[in-house]
Amino acid sequence: MNTREEDIDYTPEAEPEEARKVYGEHIEKARKYFDLLVRDGDLLGLIGPRELPKLWSRHILNSAVVADLVDDGQLVADVGSGAGFPGVPMAILRPNVKFVLIEPMERRANWLAEVVVLELDLKNVKVLRGRAEEAPLRNYDVVTARAVSALPKLLRMLAPLTVQGGQVLAMKGSKAQDEIEESKPLMKKLKLESFEIVTVGQNILSDPTTVVRVRLL
């Protein structure tokens, strides 16, 4: 039986206890980001209303734990940032890491720059409106992406942005290994050193995050 639209519960997810465990002293900024997404997400086409009941667990916390794979002082590019995932949750948690949110859509880029960065006072975040192909080459220690493209296509976009010895962090699901196999023929052309499936947040989150970590030569 099909669920009618009016029968769907779009109530924003209550803050789970894991939120404070993940964010600690930074929890207030995480809460404010949550509030901004609830206020503007559907109105500006940043997230669909169906995402509100899982906004903390599937989006904010799921993204934040990827910061475990980044070192202090590094420069991170988040490509196709959209509503800020995973870049903003990571940046809130790691003020000693610099982030560039790369987003081609004007409405989303403006929201990130004029609302999120300013209202959350994220001094470690800049917003670049444009496509990945327009970003500076060999400029970033780490490049992240979430729900953008299949891994082979993603690596063609992201690897050229990454410094020698840097890494691409792609948030993926159950087909991560299949996507790695499809990407292996690109290793020589894109100067890739290795692929690794990493699970982060497993000690805190009930549904940990799967990341494909690709190291560059």
Segments from the language model and where they lie:
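Residue-level signal for short amphipathic helical patches enriched in basic/charged
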Residues: 25, 47, 94-97, 146
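Residue-level signal for pocket-adjacent positions within structured domains
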Residues: 41-42, 85, 195
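Flexible, active-site-adjacent loop/turn segments at secondary-structure boundaries
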Residues: 44-45, 53-54, 83, 146-149
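Glycine-rich helix-loop-beta junction characteristic of Rossmann-like nucleotide cofactor-binding loops
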Residues: 66-72, 93, 134-137
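Conserved SAM-binding loop of SAM-dependent methyltransferases across substrates and taxa
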Residues: 83-96
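S-adenosylmethionine
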Residues: 96-100, 104-217
